[in-house]
């Protein structure tokens, strides 16, 4: 998932992991579990 900021990752990661824990690293999202 491409992103410009961590905020861009919250909803896609919420769908993937069920949790909004996410960071934008090198313009792509990194999802973390709960």
Swiss-Prot record:
<dbReference type="InterPro" id="IPR036574">
    <property type="entry name" value="Scorpion_toxin-like_sf"/>
</dbReference>
<dbReference type="Pfam" id="PF00451">
    <property type="entry name" value="Toxin_2"/>
</dbReference>
<dbReference type="GO" id="GO:0015459">
    <property type="term" value="F:potassium channel regulator activity"/>
</dbReference>
<comment type="similarity">
    <text>Belongs to the short scorpion toxin superfamily. Potassium channel inhibitor family. Alpha-KTx 06 subfamily.</text>
</comment>
<feature type="disulfide bond">
    <location>
        <begin position="3"/>
        <end position="24"/>
    </location>
</feature>
<keyword id="KW-0872">Ion channel impairing toxin</keyword>
<protein>
    <recommendedName>
        <fullName>Potassium channel toxin alpha-KTx 6.13</fullName>
    </recommendedName>
</protein>
<dbReference type="GO" id="GO:0090729">
    <property type="term" value="F:toxin activity"/>
</dbReference>
<dbReference type="InterPro" id="IPR001947">
    <property type="entry name" value="Scorpion_toxinS_K_inh"/>
</dbReference>
<comment type="function">
    <text>Antagonist of Kv1/KCNA potassium channels. Shows a weak interaction with muscle-type nicotinic acetylcholine receptors (nAChR), since it inhibits alpha-bungarotoxin binding to both muscle-type nAChR from T.californica (IC(50)=490 nM). This suggests it probably weakly inhibits nAChR.</text>
</comment>
<keyword id="KW-0528">Neurotoxin</keyword>
<dbReference type="GO" id="GO:0008200">
    <property type="term" value="F:ion channel inhibitor activity"/>
</dbReference>
<keyword id="KW-1220">Voltage-gated potassium channel impairing toxin</keyword>
<dbReference type="GO" id="GO:0005576">
    <property type="term" value="C:extracellular region"/>
</dbReference>
<feature type="disulfide bond">
    <location>
        <begin position="9"/>
        <end position="29"/>
    </location>
</feature>
<feature type="disulfide bond">
    <location>
        <begin position="19"/>
        <end position="34"/>
    </location>
</feature>
<keyword id="KW-0632">Potassium channel impairing toxin</keyword>
<feature type="site" description="Basic residue of the functional dyad">
    <location>
        <position position="23"/>
    </location>
</feature>
<keyword id="KW-1015">Disulfide bond</keyword>
<feature type="site" description="Aromatic residue of the functional dyad">
    <location>
        <position position="32"/>
    </location>
</feature>
<keyword id="KW-0800">Toxin</keyword>
<keyword id="KW-0027">Amidation</keyword>
<feature type="disulfide bond">
    <location>
        <begin position="13"/>
        <end position="31"/>
    </location>
</feature>
<keyword id="KW-0964">Secreted</keyword>
<feature type="modified residue" description="Cysteine amide">
    <location>
        <position position="34"/>
    </location>
</feature>
